Amino acid sequence: MLVEYEQETKSLVGVNPLRRTTITSARPALNGYQKCRCFYCFREVSIIQGSQAMADVDHFFPHMLKQCDNNKPIDGVANLVLACRECNRGENGKFEKIPTPDLLERLFNRNEYLITSHHPLRETLIAQTGLTTANRQHFLQDAYNCSIFFVGARSKKWQPVPQGDAIF
């Protein structure tokens, strides 16, 4: 079963050609690795509804990448991270910008950690990105290259100023 993020309900859902089933809220599933920290700047975030520091669920590769390649699971958990509001939609936020290669490596390491730790999302990550480490590296690099091509090679890569200690 593949898992995708459903914007309308703000939850992860199982993708089944016959039906869609909500399986869990996106924030807690992603928070297992991030431990209430923004993926990008390490600022403290919350997964508690209504909190001032409520984490956004962000697409690492811009959502508009769907227009570049329909086969990329842009709404899949392999491409979703928790982000503070400032990084996701603040004045100097990521929006549709391409993250730096350092952040791409961080995403790869996050996904590998979830796979090797036998996290409940392990099978979904493998299904979305590949069976082997090399396949998964290729998948992310291909998505990165597609993003650069689609968004623009001259576009400056985005990286925030750290707001906390790097804990992952």
Model-derived features with residue positions:
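Short, charged surface segments at domain edges that flank catalytic/cofactor-binding sites
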Residues: 1-46, 64-74
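Cys/His-coordinated zinc-binding microdomains
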Residues: 42, 85-88
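The −1 position to Zn-ligating cysteines in a subset of zinc-ribbon hairpins
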Residues: 37, 56, 83
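Intrinsically disordered or highly flexible coil/loop and linker segments, enriched in small
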Residues: 36-39, 93, 156
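Extended charged
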Residues: 1-15, 95-168
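Short amphipathic alpha-helical segments
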Residues: 79-82, 120-121
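Histidine-centered nuclease catalytic patch
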Residues: 42-80, 93-107
